[in-house]
Amino acid sequence: MNNTNLHFKNEIKKIMNYFNAGKYSIVIQKSKILLKKNSEFIPLYNIIGISLQRQKKYDEAKNIFSKGLLVDSLSLDLRLNLANTYKAVNDFVTAEKNYKKILEINPNHVLSLLNYGNLKNDLNLVDDSLSLYDRALKIDNNNFTIHFNKAFLLQSIGNFVEAIFHAKKSLEINENFTPADTLLSKMLNYKENKWHIESMVQKLKKKNLTIHNLYNLHFALGNVYEKIGNTSLSIKHIIQANEIKRKSLKHDIEDEIQLFKKIKDAFKSLNFNSLQLNEDQNHKNIIFILGMPRSGTTLVE
């Protein structure tokens, strides 16, 4: 391996480390530099696009995935990411076209079947969604995500027997996938299923749970203890779940700061003393009303 290829490979490793750390702006910046050196390296388009997705910059994500498809129109990963981006902005028609395009190329593309099934679920097309999940499971019956999504859908339509089966199957495949525990905690009768409580208590002792799985486990235990009448333990686990989830939330307020700065700058240029009312309204005062969503409060000046 020559020095150029070695440098490129090392830079990719660094970028992936930044990606895994959630430093998406750095990922985008460094990936674009590499892309200028090798515009045909398709994984870079995916890395940049997914980072933009995580930042909710969906238009930019669509653009980068589309540019990648101009380089390789048969890249299923690129087209899947493009479809998921359209789905994220509720452009279900374009998302569906891209899912169908992938499945025309490869009818057994499991991730496309899964995500297409999720889209149908979003549209409340239950039978279509279940059909796509079943197609995916015939190809990969050991995919815990498909089992969980199917369980979640079945639970929503009241088919608890099958929902419990698939939630349990999800945990058999990946016992640390605690959203399945949370789902089970809403359906099981704990007079008959004390095994699940013990399983979750033991799981809580593990050191390798992700933050996401840890707070889901606390939520599940909170549900269970509420069901069996142990209010103090229920409250304890719900509080812990909320504390963990709150710490895990990473929200960049820079966009909001810039928006408010622009609003303030715009208002600085206004001379309110020069504002004129219509002649028949001279007896009225100007009022400003500020509504604060979800606060239950409105300020009137």
Model-derived features with residue positions:
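Alpha-helical solenoid repeat scaffolds of the TPR/TPR-like class and their adjacent stem/linker regions
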Residues: 1-301
